[in-house]
Amino acid sequence: MIEADRIISGQAKVDEDVIDRAIRPKLLADYVGQPQVREQMDIFIKAAKLRQDALDHLLIFGPPGLGKTTLANIVANEMGVNIRTTSGPVLEKAGDLAAMLTNLEPHDVLFIDEIHRLSPAIEEVLYPAMEDYQLDIMIGEGPAARSIKLDLPPFTLVGATTRAGSLTSPLRDRFGIVQRLEFYSVEDLTSIVARSAGCLNLELEQQAAFEVARRSRGTPRIANRLLRRVRDYADVRNGGIISINVAKQALSMLDVDDAGFDYLDRKLLSAVIERFDGGPVGLDNLAAAIGEERDTIEDVLEPYLIQQGFLQRTPRGRIATSQTYRHFGLQKLSD
């Protein structure tokens, strides 16, 4: 099973973009959660508008599904400018980036998702553009080739990444504002679910919103995805009304448990407990035991389990915590 196949994946799915745009907040006033980020961005945006400057270049990082793209669009809306969107893997040639930069209007936002995947050649074009609002272009080939400089309008580059550590230092250092998005509280996710239900004209009980939120792994994208699937269940089984019981039944059908775990999460934790006596167990042994690639365990499964205190990573291997035993209704044996 790959990450994109899981209903509790933080990665975006191809068919979700249209619906996500419909329920996505447009302004900071509608943006739920991330209070420190929201307060800081409110100050930075208002200051830039008072000075009639472009906002400083902004790097947003954090796990998938926490609202990096949403925040980039909010920045453009609050500044009253256009946003042009691309991604690191799409920008294969320097000319692709040059074309986007030369079409920007003053103070526009250029949003590059997965910015850690930019090639070195593209980064070289970005450096003078970010620092001096200039574009260095090579004209001609061979001995006759020469470099010319084009002036660019002041603009804001917003970069988004799930892997801030993979950015080169020269690129990272050129961002004047760096914001990290954290996992959301259940209370904030409940508000997000209720807001999304309103946008979709759903009849949703408050307790049902909480039930969806607490199984959403701290991630708005997962909360909204689960809400849509619960809506499907309610339309067929309960005349479209999403009660607490309907929400629980739908989520049970989807195999998402009270902790937001799916089959793969439970398979990993069960293997650590049952096959390796709670650990420590090495990554290769664990991968072989559950039939998954070690990269899948490290990049997809472990981060949330570790963050929530269900799995501990030690020099000797992975260990199931007391919380894991309680989740499965088991008693942890004393050392």
Curated annotation (Swiss-Prot):
Binding annotation for ATP: I23, R24, G65, K68, T69, T70, E131, D132, Y133, R174, Y184, R221
UniProt KW Nucleotide-binding keyword: yes
CDD domains named among the record's database cross-references: AAA (cd00009)
Reactions listed under catalytic activity: ATP + H2O = ADP + phosphate + H(+)
Superkingdom: Bacteria
Keywords tagged on the record: ATP-binding, Cytoplasm, DNA damage, DNA recombination, DNA repair, DNA-binding, Hydrolase, Nucleotide-binding
Location of the region described as Large ATPase domain (RuvB-L) in the Swiss-Prot/TrEMBL record: 4-184
Record-level Gene Ontology MF annotations: ATP binding; ATP hydrolysis activity; four-way junction DNA binding; four-way junction helicase activity
Keyword tRNA processing: no
One example of a Gene Ontology biological process annotation: DNA repair
SUPFAM superfamilies (alphabetical): P-loop containing nucleoside triphosphate hydrolases (SSF52540), Winged helix' DNA-binding domain (SSF46785)
Compartments where found: Cytoplasm
InterPro entries, per the entry: AAA+_ATPase, AAA_lid_4, DNA_helicase_Holl-junc_RuvB, P-loop_NTPase, RuvB-like_N, RuvB_C, WH-like_DNA-bd_sf, WH_DNA-bd_sf
Free-text function comment from the UniProt entry: The RuvA-RuvB-RuvC complex processes Holliday junction (HJ) DNA during genetic recombination and DNA repair, while the RuvA-RuvB complex plays an important role in the rescue of blocked DNA replication forks via replication fork reversal (RFR). RuvA specifically binds to HJ cruciform DNA, conferring on it an open structure. The RuvB hexamer acts as an ATP-dependent pump, pulling dsDNA into and through the RuvAB complex. RuvB forms 2 homohexamers on either side of HJ DNA bound by 1 or 2 RuvA tetramers; 4 subunits per hexamer contact DNA at a time.
Annotated PANTHER family: HOLLIDAY JUNCTION BRANCH MIGRATION COMPLEX SUBUNIT RUVB, PTHR42848
Full protein name: Holliday junction branch migration complex subunit RuvB
Gene: ruvB
